[in-house]
Design a protein with these regions (language model features):
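Generic, well-ordered alpha-helical scaffold segments in large soluble proteins
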Residues: 35, 147-150, 154, 182, ...
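Contiguous, structured surface segment used for ligand recognition
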Residues: 1-125
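A generic structural signal for short
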Residues: 21, 135-136, 205
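Loop/helix-junction capping segments adjacent to catalytic residues or to phosphate/diphosphate-binding pockets
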Residues: 26, 89, 138-141, 170
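A conserved hydrophobic secondary-structure block that centers on an alpha-helix together
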Residues: 133-166, 173
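Aromatic/hydrophobic pocket-lining residues that form the small-molecule binding cavity
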Residues: 88, 144, 213-214
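Aromatic- and acidic-residue-enriched carbohydrate-binding clefts of CAZyme catalytic domains
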Residues: 123, 167-219
Length: 219
């Protein structure tokens, strides 16, 4: 793991082109496009041609552990090499972290730049997890997606979605109706009084999430 910073910067600009070594990296670059949406006005072109591009992402055996990557930024271009897909995602997240926090909110478009650096990075821990407990408190789809985005920002790679306790089962799956017909209910007991009082104060209602309304994917 190393970081070398030099003078100069790579300026993000309209009309940028991003190259990838193969089409399997298109979803990863889609993540980068979402990041750049608040930075530049025009759409970002993605191509499998490595010539005349501003950023290039390549899957390549770098000799490192899974999730490792090498990132080089110059005033002219940014190049990333990674062992695997997760390394590409981590490199994109590093690009996001090198930009000012102002890119995280929509506003007037400004000129942003990335410092000239050379980075070789690899995860210290293989399992970097976060658990979301949706069994006792409802989370809508946008809130779950926001949690996943923050996980990506902090390079967490394991999402534990805690959906079931004696308090209920939170996703309706038509193939398994008993999960909600029986699993979503239980008898009242004395431990519920405090929770019910809190729920009344906060005005939060638990309810089922239809299966077709959820799209949480790995990547």
């Amino acid at each position: 793991v190393s970081l070398t910073e030099q003078s100069g910067s790579f300026v993000l600009k309209d009309g940028m082109k991003i190259g990838v070594s193969d089409q399997s990296l298109f979803p990863a670059v889609g993540y980068l496009q979402e990041i750049l949406r608040n930075v530049i006005s025009s759409s970002v072109e993605v191509t499998t041609d490595k010539n005349q591009v501003d950023m290039y992402f390549q899957l390549k055996d770098t000799g490192g552990k899974p999730g490792s990557y090498k990132l080089q930024s110059t005033p002219e271009y940014i190049r990333v090499e990674a062992n695997d897909y997760s390394g590409i995602i981590s490199a994109i997240t590093t690009i996001r972290q090198l930009l000012p926090a102002a890119i995280e909110v929509q506003g007037e478009k400004q000129t942003y730049s990335i410092p000239v650096v050379q980075i070789e990075d690899a995860p210290r821990f293989e399992w970097r997890g976060f658990m979301l407990d949706a069994s006792r408190h409802f989370w809508n789809k946008d809130e779950v997606k926001h949690v996943l985005d923050l996980m990506s920002l902090y390079k967490l790679n394991k999402f534990h979605w805690h959906l079931s306790d004696d308090q209920g089962w939170r996703i309706e799956i038509e193939k398994y109706p008993l999960l909600t017909e029986k699993g979503a209910w239980r008898k009242f007991n004395k431990h519920d009084r405090t929770c019910m009082a809190r729920a009344k104060e906060e005005d939060n209602t638990d309810f089922l999430i239809p299966e077709d309304k959820i799209r949480i994917v790995e990547g």
